[in-house]
Amino acid sequence: MRIRMNAPTFDHVLIVASDLERSIEFYTLIGFEHLETIQRPNDRVAVMRLGGVKVEIMNLPEGEETLREPRRLTDLGFRHIGFKVYDLTSVYERLKDKISFDSPPRKIQGRGNRMTVFFKDPDGVEMHFVQE
């Protein structure tokens, strides 16, 4: 499939974090590269990269409140972030004492040999590793 010159391409995702340093440590642990931290008048943004994708992590600005309600599988909008890995068992073994997984790796019903394991970042953003 050819990409047209004026067609949009993916640039970044922004995640708001309650503790920027803790989030930088977490995302680095799961494989992201920390490119830089930008200080702006009211907040700081850590620019992270995994493969060719950038994720910006912004600290919750001072004095701002946030509301985090548990999401249901059927809620509209953003659900989770999936990361492809080539050896899910070794990734799980390396990280299981450092982050909290929902369960050990398991097969995805109806998807052949595809396996997955879910976890959350320090602020509850749902993620999973998947192996084809």
Task: Please describe what each predicted stretch is.
Residues A17-E21, D75-D123:
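Vicinal oxygen chelate
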Residues T9, N42-R44, G51, G77, ...:
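Exposed loop/turn and edge beta-strand positions of beta-sandwich/beta-sheet ligand-binding modules
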Residues D43, E64-E69, P104:
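A short, acidic/glycine-rich surface segment
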Residues M48-G52, F119-P122, E132:
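Active-site beta-strand termini and strand-to-loop segments that position acidic
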Residues M1-M5, P70:
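A detector for short, charged/polar N-terminal pre-domain segments
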Residues I15-V55:
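Core segments of cupin and vicinal oxygen chelate
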